[in-house]
Swiss-Prot record:
NAD(+) binds at M324, D343, V400, V401, E402, K407, S429, N453. One of its GO terms (biological process) is fatty acid beta-oxidation. The keyword Isomerase applies. The record marks E119, E139 as: Important for catalytic activity. Keywords: Fatty acid metabolism, Isomerase, Lipid degradation, Lipid metabolism, Lyase, Multifunctional enzyme, NAD, Oxidoreductase. The gene is fadB. Residues 311-716 are annotated as: 3-hydroxyacyl-CoA dehydrogenase. Its EC number is 4.2.1.17, 5.1.2.3, 5.3.3.8, 1.1.1.35. This is Fatty acid oxidation complex subunit alpha. It comes from Shewanella baltica (strain OS195). GO terms for molecular function: 3-hydroxybutyryl-CoA epimerase activity; delta(3)-delta(2)-enoyl-CoA isomerase activity; enoyl-CoA hydratase activity; long-chain-3-hydroxyacyl-CoA dehydrogenase activity; NAD+ binding. CDD domains: crotonase-like (cd06558).
């Protein structure tokens, strides 16, 4: 053994080829500080052994290296610039040491080689992947750029245009696609991986492959003609800004870094990367996006832990077909759990099956599935008009019409057809789980399971704990949601649960602006372009449906009359009473037509303005800051109330619920990250300026205490 540490082992193989194996404790290899230090020491040992003729990098895991240890980032990025620069320079010295070894090097890549893992393989002369490999630099998704030489080496390996696409999108690349652009030199079967990499090194040692020429290309400036370079980078800037926009600076910074470094050798090019990396690491956007990543890991970790208490779900059922039932059936079947789709009407079953078939056909058309896989998924969906079909179901999801009496009746019926230990969950967005549980003989086997529409696109599922729901019931539904590919958060029962409870105060703020003459299209523009929502409140209400919004608003008013009670007609009432239901009937705040791609196209409609003018008077202009404050303050305070009341267990789960359930702007990180960035004391001072608008604008006593103590919701 040439070198050994808890994360890396180096041994000498035959023909004097050294094998460096990444072998960290745990299921995957990460580039944490310990691994980086071990790699540095291992390379020193390798350099000192004069017998070594070549080096192959391997992994003992199913993956190569998944990237840096992101749990270290927030603490590290909070350090002074000088400390951060020192860390980046030391890390890059290790990668340079690997690249400068006096003999050929190769990487044997299986599974993920992402971020620092990708930058590791780029520092070797040859790269061999097996068919499971996925390679990429996802750093821009975290608000930063690659910091271990990725922006320098990748363009010199695969060309500037390809590198710009890889780095600015942050997408993983399959082995076959990486081979096409030259990121890897060969793709082989998993069992042949190490042997293929070693053979490539033998050929290099025998001078059949010119490893030094490859290395020199990475050490030199890009060989791009001046005009071609100008066109390439100008085009990239336009395309990247069109996608990333002003709120996400990292992709544009990546283009700029690659452009500036294109005429430099390695040392100068790396300095350009270092400076841009440090600048981005200090941004609120990076803190927010890294926070989302860590929160996502936290939520998934909780779900995995809950799985230990879960009843195994081998068969499922959904009651109520149509679009929602069909979406749930598709999601379950496509992730491997057979499901019965039960309804009382054949047309509804046909609609549900058609919905599943449509979603699968779209997957086939995009090349993400095959006709054979589509047939297998459809065979996992069993439509039925008979309750007898659900008798072997481990979990039954009730998804009938959103009416308490109808749901209660169906739930009571279901218990008579399933086994004693079957779990029943209601897909409801507003109806109390405790209320529905009153119709159940075994309320401990019952909880809520709130899917968001469209089911196949929305990652969040709210699992609602009723006062009688058992831990096994909650754990089993959490595990089933995870198995379906969803991110579950557990919330306690209350009107609107978590997501809708915090959404409707936002709509109340919007209604308040319109009642004073606000222009709904102008408000949407501010909330989309400046705050960063994917849809402004008027557009969102049109998509949700004004009938749904009207009903849910009434539920919230009844549940929280002190804050959400209504004293008169509001804009949602005006639209609903004039049968303007939104996209579903082609007219709401906006009017809708179908564009050339078959997608809904919205236009401003004078009729809407006329109805609102009759109700509230002439239009009045509001400043953007005023619009943001009046809509967001109620949502933020209600989110804090949910945490204080234990409706949601942690800031991390609340923020993931907002990002995944409502599309809260990821670059702001969620309500609690937004509060911490703004400063709780600053928010309290802002809210107090609007306190005259009513209960929704009154901060809690606990918020005032936190503000007075200069506290925050996140510890890092």
């Amino acid at each position: 053994m040439i070198y050994q540490s808890p994360t890396i082992q180096v041994e000498l193989l035959e023909d004097n080829i050294a094998k460096l194996c990444f072998n960290a404790p745990g299921s995957v290899n990460k580039f944490d500080r310990e691994t980086l230090a071990s790699l540095d020491a291992a390379l020193d040992s390798i350099k000192q052994d004069s017998n070594i003729k070549a080096l192959v990098l391997t992994s003992s895991k199913d993956t190569f290296i998944v990237g840096a240890d992101i749990t270290e980032f927030l603490g590290l990025f909070a350090q002074d610039d000088a400390v951060l620069l020192s860390w980046v320079e030391q890390a890059n010295a290790v990668f340079n040491k690997l690249e400068d070894l006096p003999f050929p090097t190769a990487s044997a890549i299986k599974g993920f080689a992402l971020g620092g893992g990708c930058e590791t393989i780029l520092a070797t002369d040859f790269r061999v992947a097996d068919t499971t490999a996925k390679i990429g630099l996802p750093e821009t998704k975290l608000g930063i750029i690659p910091g271990f030489g990725g922006t320098v080496r990748l363009p010199r390996v695969i060309g500037a245009d390809n590198a710009l696409e890889w780095i600015t999108t942050g997408k993983d690349q399959r082995a076959e696609d990486a081979l096409k652009v030259g990121a890897v030199d060969a793709v082989v079967a998993p069992q042949a991986l190490e042997a293929a990499a070693i053979q490539m090194l033998k050929d290099a040692v025998a001078e059949k492959l010119d490893w030094q020429a490859r290395r020199n290309r990475k050490l030199s400036a890009l060989t791009l003609p001046k005009l071609e370079a100008m066109m390439s980078f100008t085009t990239a800037k336009g395309m990247v800004f069109a996608v990333a926009g002003k709120h996400y600076p990292a992709p544009m910074a990546a283009v700029s870094v690659i452009e500036q470094a294109s005429t430099k050798g390695r040392a100068e090019a790396l300095q350009i990367e270092h400076q841009a990396f440090i600048k981005l690491a200090k941004t609120d956007v990076a803190k927010a996006l890294i926070g989302i990543f860590l929160n996502d890991q936290f939520v998934k970790g909780k779900a995995k832990k809950a799985g230990k208490l879960a009843k195994e779900v081998n068969n499922a059922a959904v009651l109520g077909a149509g679009i929602m039932g069909g979406g749930i059936a598709y999601q379950s079947a496509s992730k491997g759990t057979p499901i019965v789709m039960k309804d009382i009407a054949q047309p509804a079953l046909d609609l549900g099956l058609n919905e599943a078939a449509k979603l699968l056909s779209a997957q086939v058309a995009r090349g993400r599935s095959t006709p054979e896989k589509m047939a297998k998924v459809l065979n996992n969906i069993t439509p039925s008009l008979d309750y007898a079909a659900i008798k072997h179901s481990d979990v039954v999801v009730e998804a009938v019409v959103e009416h308490p009496k109808i749901k209660a009746q169906v739930l009571a019926e279901v218990e008579g057809y399933v086994s004693e230990d079957a779990i029943i969950a209601s897909n409801t967005s507003t109806i109390s789980i405790n209320l529905l549980a009153k119709s159940m003989k075994k309320p401990e086997r019952f909880c809520g399971m709130h899917f968001f529409n469209p089911v196949h696109k929305m990652p969040l599922v709210e699992v609602i704990r009723g006062e009688h729901s058992s831990e096994e019931t909650i754990a089993s539904v959490v595990a089933y949601a995870s198995k379906m590919g969803k991110t579950p958060i557990v919330v306690n029962d209350c009107p609107g649960f978590f997501v809708n409870r915090v959404l409707f105060p936002y709509f109340a703020g919007f209604n308040g602006l319109l009642a004073e003459g606000g222009d709904f299209a102008a408000i949407d523009k501010v909330m989309e372009k400046q705050f960063g929502w994917p849809m402004g409140p008027a557009y969102l209400l049109d998509v949700v449906g004004l009938d749904t919004g009207h009903h849910a608003q009434a539920v919230m008013a009844e549940g929280f009359p002190d804050r959400m009670g209504k004293s008169g007609t509001d804009a949602i009432d005006v639209m609903f009473e004039n049968k303007r239901l939104g996209q579903k009937n082609g007219k709401g705040f906006y009017v809708y037509s179908v564009d050339s791609r078959g997608k809904p196209k919205k236009d401003v409609d004078p009729t809407s303005y006329g109805l609102l003018k009759d109700a509230f008077g002439e239009l009045k202009a509001f400043e953007a800051d005023d619009i943001i404050a009046r809509t967001m303050i109620p949502m933020i305070i209600e989110t804090v109330r949910c945490l204080e009341e234990g409706i949601v267990a942690s800031p991390a789960e609340a923020d993931m619920g907002l990002v995944y359930g409502l599309g809260f702007p990821p670059f702001r990180g969620g309500v609690f990250r937004y509060l911490d960035t703004m400063g709780v004391a600053n928010f309290v001072a802002l809210a107090d300026k609007y306190a005259h608008l009513g209960g929704l604008y009154q901060v809690t006593d606990a918020m005032r205490t936190l503000a007075a103590n200069n506290g925050s919701y996140y510890q890092a």
